[in-house]
Design a protein with these regions (language model features):
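Intrinsically disordered, low-complexity transactivation/modulatory regions
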Residues: 1-10
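C-terminal transcriptional activation/regulatory domains of eukaryotic transcription factors
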Residues: 26-132, 137-149, 181-184
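Acidic/serine-rich, low-complexity amphipathic helices located in mid- to C-terminal regulatory regions
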Residues: 144-201
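Short, compositionally biased low-complexity segments
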Residues: 13-30, 163-171
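Tryptophan-centered motif/residue detector
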Residues: 15, 60, 193-194
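Intrinsically disordered, low-complexity regions enriched for glutamine and histidine
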Residues: 9, 14, 18-21, 56, ...
């Protein structure tokens, strides 16, 4: 996606002062604006970010299908993305960044952490649960544990568990044949549930 093709946030200044003007349909554009601003500041591309994730975090917490993630990036480039995917990209950015030297985990002073939690909370409040939102929550949970804020991690992982229940991912994962556990959606379900149990210990 070119810089000129970035989504514009409708009436951003107005809804910040009057939250009742914020429509659920705006959330993808708002999160997308944050994603592209941060990527530009870091001189990164979305594909480069995802490659970094699969070279690092994915080796220890495999919760995403590379095939599906690349397909979703193509949808973003074609201006046809699911809005929750932008929150997932923010969470991947958060998990793969080097924290600033003055970062104080107890105060949540990382700007990217605050931005990521802000969009995650908005989606939880105004949008339906989705596998992308659960994956974002798991990334945030891992970040919170690693940076010494376990109380927040406990709340975040609890939220993920409830979304898993709403989406009935347990039954979907349990019904997947072994031959299907290779880069498909059932594979994601099973790995998401595994990661959730691991982080909830």
């Amino acid at each position: 996606m070119t810089l000129a093709a970035r989504p514009k946030v409708p009436e951003a200044d107005k809804w910040q002062l009057s939250p009742q003007l914020l429509q659920p349909s705006y959330l993808g554009m708002i999160a997308g604006g944050s994603v592209f601003r941060i990527l530009e500041e870091k001189d990164m591309t979305m594909r480069g970010l995802v490659h970094k994730y699969f070279d690092t975090i994915h080796n220890y917490m495999p919760i995403m299908s590379k095939v599906k993630l690349n397909k979703q990036i193509q949808e973003v480039e074609g201006l046809n993305s699911k809005s929750a995917f932008m929150v997932l990209i923010l969470a991947i950015l958060l998990l793969t960044e080097h924290p600033p030297a003055d970062f104080d985990g107890a105060l949540g002073s990382s700007e990217l952490y605050q931005v990521c939690k802000y969009h995650f909370s908005l989606f939880l409040s105004l949008k339906e649960p989705s596998i992308e939102l659960i994956q974002a929550g798991l990334c945030i949970t891992l970040y919170e544990y690693v940076h010494g804020i376990p109380e927040r991690a406990y709340v975040t992982i609890g939220t993920c568990a409830r979304m898993v229940s709403v989406l009935r991912l347990h039954s979907n994962a349990n019904s997947a044949p072994q031959s299907a556990l290779t880069e498909d959606y059932f594979d994601e379900n099973a790995h998401v549930i595994s990661a959730m149990h691991l982080l909830n210990r």
